[in-house]
A protein has these predicted regions:
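Residue-level recognition of conserved beta-strand positions in structured domain cores
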Residues: 60, 87, 127-129
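Hydrophobic ligand-binding cavity/cleft-lining segments
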Residues: 1-43
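Hydrophobic-ligand binding "helix-grip"
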Residues: 46-50, 57, 64-120, 162
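Hydrophobic pocket/interface hotspot
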Residues: 22, 32, 56, 74, ...
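Glycine-rich, low-complexity intrinsically disordered segments
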Residues: 21-25, 94, 159
């Protein structure tokens, strides 16, 4: 199924960090575990092969030992400018998994992230998500989750802001 008529979920945020630093903390596994997780979760596995055709496989553990696994498959990389990848839930071995709390969630999300210098010396970061080859039920699940995605990204970006400050102090 094509999702070309679907409005992507887009969020833009200015970070008070140079583009090179923001790129580094988003493309190196040793940085990602400091900030890339929902509130209350921590990273238990991070394996990064950051190149076109490569992937990032990660595991998170949250309250009561709940685990979530994910996989990013890199489609396009323009250093310090753009990353395009397919995002999916996975199992601990890197095979395709399903959203643990939303069984109708699309199997794959097409994600485009861009990085631009801001007038204030920071970085303007924009990320766009949309279902990739999803059925109507998956698209409806995605559309119904926009408020939650806004809240989730706000929390994750707050953690990223704090981490960037520690690196620059």
């Amino acid at each position: 199924m094509s999702n070309t008529a679907l409005t992507p979920f887009v969020i833009t945020r200015e970070f008070r960090a140079p583009r090179a630093l923001l790129w580094q903390v988003q493309t190196q596994a040793e940085h990602l575990h400091h900030w890339l997780s929902p509130e209350g979760f921590h990273t238990i596995h991070a394996n990064m092969d950051f190149r076109v055709g490569g992937r990032y496989h990660y595991g998170l553990e949250g309250p009561n030992g709940m685990q979530m696994w994910g996989l990013q498959q890199f489609l396009e990389i323009v250093p310090e400018r753009k990353i395009v990848h397919l995002q999916s839930f996975s199992d601990k071995d890197g095979g395709l998994g399903r959203h643990p709390m939303a069984p109708t969630w699309p199997a794959y999300m097409h994600v485009t992230a861009t990085y631009e210098d801001s007038a204030s010396g920071g970085t303007l970061y924009t990320i766009a998500w949309q279902p990739h080859e999803s059925d109507a039920e998956g698209v409806a699940s995605f559309d119904g989750a926009r408020a939650g995605m806004n809240a989730g990204f706000a929390g994750t970006f707050a953690k990223l802001d704090a981490y960037l400050l520690t690196l620059q102090s």
